Amino acid sequence: MIRKLTILAACLTTVLAICAQKRDKYEFKRNLPVYADSLIADLTYPLAWGNSDITDFGEWKRAARQKVFDCMLPPPPRPEGGYKAKVIFEEQRDGYKARKLEIQLSRYYTVPAYVLIPDGKGPFPAVNVLHDHGAHLFIGKEKVISPLACEDSTVIRDANEWAAGYEGQFYGDYLAKNGFVVLATDAPMWGERGQMEGARRDRYDMIAGNMMMYGIDMSAYMTYDDIAATEFLASMPEVDKGRIGCTGWSMGAYRAWMLAALSDYIKAAVPVCWMITTDEQMSFKYQRTENGGFANCFPGLRRWLDYPHIASIACPCAMLFINGAQDKLFPVAGVQKAFDIMHQTWESQGVGDRLVTEIWDMPHSCPREAQRRALEFFKKHL
């Protein structure tokens, strides 16, 4: 016993010594460089609408969109013969059918997905519902659509627990009950696109870094997949391809406005709780320990455009942004600054009424009322 205690004490001493190792001089603190303010001051966003010397809005959109794609690095190669889907399972729900699919979105891989199709005669309007991050990678599509009966009981239980963040209501099922075809896919590293060793948040950044060694960007692959999945959605016979929207909250909101900016199929979008400016996101003043990360990182893009400038590429798309006044991830000062930039863009094109921005008295969340507001917006614009 004494020998075991001695070994344990030695191990603890070693661990504490390693954790406590510090030098008098350093260059990084709280995961940011000490010269972060200087980096921010050097960001002038020369390609932003109003900063760029391009004065024709259509020409600017094409140039800005191409710059985003350039910074996203190469896309995954499209599958030969177009997108193909295999139906894995189907079940009837209250007013709509639910299917589990495997969609060949790339020559490299298939993407697991759920699709919900309302009963009755189509074609129907459709919404690509994009799941969040939540530092929880075990489930993806199951965060926004109730798992089908073919899934493991652990997946079903986990999804039901996660739905508590939506006040017990699955966002996708809610839209399907109200007449929309709904698609939800797993993003890379989530759900059935995760690690063989199991879902571990601490491995995400390491894998993203490894992917960059292949000359590709994992965050970009997520966006490329969202674009491809929307193209697949538009090809479904049950879908009116002229009436497609997208929505999501947290990382799903980021995915939604990125998709609206980069895909002409999107006619309306509702991002909930993800919009800010880089000067507020990457600042020391909010005492955060995580400021962004690989989930929304395209190399070099910030030298040209900030988040609201990228979202502005979507104009004149109808968009409703909802953020929370109590959201500690997205401080109101940065949110409002971003909203103001976007409003200037929509108003410059005479379509100011097609951009709605709201700050609610809520934390980082997507309650039933936000889902109801999104449904109302989609009914109006799709």
Sequence positions of predicted segments:
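Cap/lid segment of the alpha/beta-hydrolase catalytic domain
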Residues: G122, V129-Y224, A234-S235, E280-S283
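Glycine-rich nucleophile elbow surrounding the catalytic serine of serine-hydrolase chemistry
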Residues: G248-A260
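Alpha/beta-hydrolase fold nucleophile elbow
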Residues: E238-S250
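N-terminal pre-domain segments of enzymes
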Residues: Q21-D70, P74
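N-terminal cap/lid segment of alpha/beta-hydrolase-fold proteins
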Residues: D70-G122, A126-N128
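C-terminal catalytic histidine-bearing segment of alpha/beta-hydrolase fold enzymes
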Residues: D340-L382
